């Protein structure tokens, strides 16, 4: 699923560039997607593509860091 948030499903929207002379040209508004490692409740860790709103809202859990000895 390219250019789509795996949690909320946010994807690109279509809009227009509007010039000073009011000429409209199609454009795409892409969501701000980030790749982030997520720890699921069952303990497994997976890299997912999510939007920044889901990161700020706390829908993901960062995995704990274990340093080797």
UniProtKB/Swiss-Prot annotation:
An MF annotation (GO) of this entry: structural constituent of ribosome
Pfam family, one: Ribosomal_L28
Domain of life according to the entry: Bacteria
One Gene Ontology cellular component annotation held by this UniProt entry: ribonucleoprotein complex
Gene Ontology biological process terms from the UniProt entry: translation
InterPro entries hit by this protein: Bacterial_rp_bL28, Ribosomal_bL28, Ribosomal_bL28/bL31-like_sf, Ribosomal_bL28_bact-type, Ribosomal_bL28_sf
SUPFAM superfamilies: L28p-like
The keyword Ribosomal protein is assigned to this record: yes
Alphabetical UniProt keywords: Ribonucleoprotein, Ribosomal protein
Disulfide bonds: none
UniProt KW Cytoplasm keyword: no
Family: Belongs to the bacterial ribosomal protein bL28 family.
PANTHER family noted in UniProt: 50S RIBOSOMAL PROTEIN L28, LARGE RIBOSOMAL SUBUNIT PROTEIN BL28A
Alphabetized HAMAP family for the sequence: Ribosomal_bL28 (MF_00373)
Name of the protein in its database record: Large ribosomal subunit protein bL28
Organism listed in the record: Lawsonia intracellularis (strain PHE/MN1-00)
